A protein has these predicted regions:
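Extracellular LysM carbohydrate-binding repeats and other cell-envelope/extracellular binding modules
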Residues: 228-240
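Active-site-adjacent loop/helix surface patches within enzyme catalytic domains
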Residues: 1-131
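Disulfide-bonded cysteine-rich modules in secreted/extracellular proteins
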Residues: 185, 193-211, 240
């Protein structure tokens, strides 16, 4: 990811990566801008206390503008709670969020390449900030109409657009729950494959006396998930 460091007016002092709790999505509100354009502006032209960590554009480019170890001045001004806005006001702020700005989305939805870039940015952020589990809007923190066409509470067109973006990013709660379940299952399967042995290997251990005799052997094999009769049949064949 290209890094064009913003002027120091755009961010605050060093913070811990572990303090970051959420990723906030914004839009620049500008048409035809690119991630590099925005990076250069905040590096050389910006004159106010405003900034964002990463800019993502329609071509699929990400440009980092503010180090993740610094709070960008991006969600500090309260606007309104009307229409379901600002539900995280007082909980999320500049110091515990990382901000991603979507370029050229003032009048249109993000492109497929842009969505892919945002997913990459989120993955990059979470590698450094493992507690950044939420993905929210500027609207959800401060009540600002940002990211523009995706602003609004449940039942609005903006909310529908926001839910679609979350779905495209794989960030809906049910998607994340499913991901966790799949990851857990894969981990369990990998563990089983590493620790389990073939019936023939177990039969050899039985012959070597490692599983005991009689009822004790049967109990141990069954408890370990092996079919006693199958193992015993292999043992008998080996001893012929």
């Amino acid at each position: 990811m290209k890094f064009i460091r913003a002027k120091s007016i755009s961010y605050g002092s060093v913070r811990s990566y572990e303090d970051v709790k959420a990723i906030c999505i914004h839009f620049t509100g500008i048409s035809n801008d690119t991630a590099e354009n925005e990076g250069n502006y905040f590096a050389h032209g910006n004159t106010r206390a405003a900034g964002a960590h990463i800019f993502s554009d329609r071509a699929g480019n990400n440009v980092k503008s503010v180090p993740l170890s610094r709070p960008a001045w991006s969600v500090g001004i309260f606007f309104t709670r009307a229409g379901g806005a600002a539900k995280y006001w007082g909980t999320l702020n500049n110091y515990n969020t990382v901000s991603i700005e979507m370029c050229d989305c003032a009048t249109k939805d993000p492109s497929k390449k842009q969505i892919k870039a945002i997913k990459k940015a989120i993955k990059y952020i979470r590698k450094k900030c493992p507690n950044a589990t939420k993905v929210v809007r500027h609207f959800d923190i401060c009540g600002k109409q940002c990211p523009g066409r995706m602003s609004g509470g449940p039942g609005t067109k903006g909310y529908e657009r926001w839910q679609k973006l979350l779905r495209d990013l794989g960030e809906l709660p049910e998607q994340k729950t499913k991901k966790k379940a799949v990851k857990k299952a894969k981990k369990a399967a990998a563990k089983t494959s590493k620790t389990s042995k073939t019936n023939k290997e177990i039969a050899k251990e039985v012959i070597a006396g490692k599983w005991g005799n009689g009822k004790i052997r049967k109990q141990r094999l069954t408890a370990a998930g092996y079919d006693y009769d199958t193992i015993q049949r292999i043992v008998n064949n080996m001893l012929k």
